[in-house]
Amino acid sequence: MDASFDKAAANYDDTFTHTAVGKMQRALVYAELSKHLTSVKNILEINCGTGEDAIWFAKQNFNVTATDISAKMIEVARRKASLNFQTADINLIAKVFENEKFDLLFSNFGGLNCLSKSELENFFATVDSILAEKGKLALVIMTKNTLWERFYFLAKAQFKNISRRKKESVLAHVDGENITTYYYNPKDIVNLANANFETVSIKPIGFFIPPSYLDGFFKNKKGFLRFLNRMEQGVKNTTSLSKYADHYLIILQKR
């Protein structure tokens, strides 16, 4: 997995971070996440990519440690800011930081979708050990039922792909690389995490705002994209739409 994301590192900001869709989806995450940061001081980010979120946290005066399995992603992040960026595997994260405690563990835009169900079970079974009392997880995860993708494949007459996210795993295309990806609806995460975490909130990210792979289509339709963004603002607190969005933000608190 690390080598695959190494190849994506050089172009990741251009193909997602700095796109109009990427900025809109990230703004949604920040607006909701900010509601849960009042008692937070120390943050651990996993799957930090090129460091965009770690830089945002640092600008809010949080102590942030940001990790990614891809050494190339970490190289790009370190060129952008002098923060505590480290190469680390999600599956070993509780071991790597066994002597530390964090108030918040954050994973943005589908980082945890790289984990199989058994790996995700292990993550939830162990990660509470590095969280402070009442510490939280803030996780942005890709769903099984996103309507945008269904409409996209229907329009392209690719009928066999309409429900592809419901398969056990899918090879997702990321900057020329095929990444094994697992999709989880909110209920899946609630059930997997329930032993050690209680659910605080679940909010849709990208119900009207399209997935990032459609940014090119909307490049010359900025007015329509702004309209979709306004529509998004009207449903951003509607939990029931979360499993139909591109992503959702789930906040879990350590029991």
In which residue ranges do the predicted regions lie?
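A short glycine-rich, Lys/Arg-flanked "PGG" loop and its adjoining helix->strand segment in the class I
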Residues: 121-133
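A C-terminal cap/extension of S-adenosyl-L-methionine-dependent methyltransferases
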Residues: 201-255
